């Protein structure tokens, strides 16, 4: 690839600007003491039916915690320590009932058709 073409491609990407991913997860990070509870919020604005919560432990791949195929329905994969609700299409909050050291992880929310 010529240097001129490479510079043109890089310049074009600079003008693209930030893109909304359509899924928002808050808070971005949080530290809890053992026994504390908290709710991780997940919202999507793409009218997707499916929403999922995953966790990724250090050195491991993603593991499904909960999923929902539509508002009003939920199914769990990891049975202990979590609660969810899906009252509408947009929101799928995950509640850690009582934080334990075994729940130290990165939590990720996703949505799809």
UniProtKB/Swiss-Prot annotation:
Disulfide bonds: 42-109
Annotated glycosylation sites: 83
Keyword Signal recorded: yes
Record-level GO BP terms: adaptive immune response; cell surface receptor signaling pathway
Bilayer-spanning residue ranges: none
Subunit-level organization: Alpha-beta TR is a heterodimer composed of an alpha and beta chain; disulfide-linked. The alpha-beta TR is associated with the transmembrane signaling CD3 coreceptor proteins to form the TR-CD3 (TcR or TCR). The assembly of alpha-beta TR heterodimers with CD3 occurs in the endoplasmic reticulum where a single alpha-beta TR heterodimer associates with one CD3D-CD3E heterodimer, one CD3G-CD3E heterodimer and one CD247 homodimer forming a stable octameric structure. CD3D-CD3E and CD3G-CD3E heterodimers preferentially associate with TR alpha and TR beta chains, respectively.
Name of the protein in its database record: T cell receptor beta variable 6-8
UniProt source species: Homo sapiens (Human)
């Amino acid at each position: 690839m010529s240097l001129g073409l490479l510079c043109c491609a890089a310049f074009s990407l600079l003008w693209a600007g930030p893109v909304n991913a359509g899924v928002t997860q808050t808070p971005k990070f949080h530290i809890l003491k053992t026994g504390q509870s908290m709710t991780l919020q997940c919202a999507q604005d793409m009218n997707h039916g499916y929403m999922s919560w995953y966790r990724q432990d250090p050195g491991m791949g993603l593991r499904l915690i909960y999923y929902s195929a539509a508002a009003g329905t939920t199914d769990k994969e990891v049975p202990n320590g979590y609660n969810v609700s899906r009252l509408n299409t947009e929101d799928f909050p995950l509640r850690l009932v009582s934080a334990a050291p075994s729940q130290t992880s990165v939590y990720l929310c996703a949505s799809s058709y």
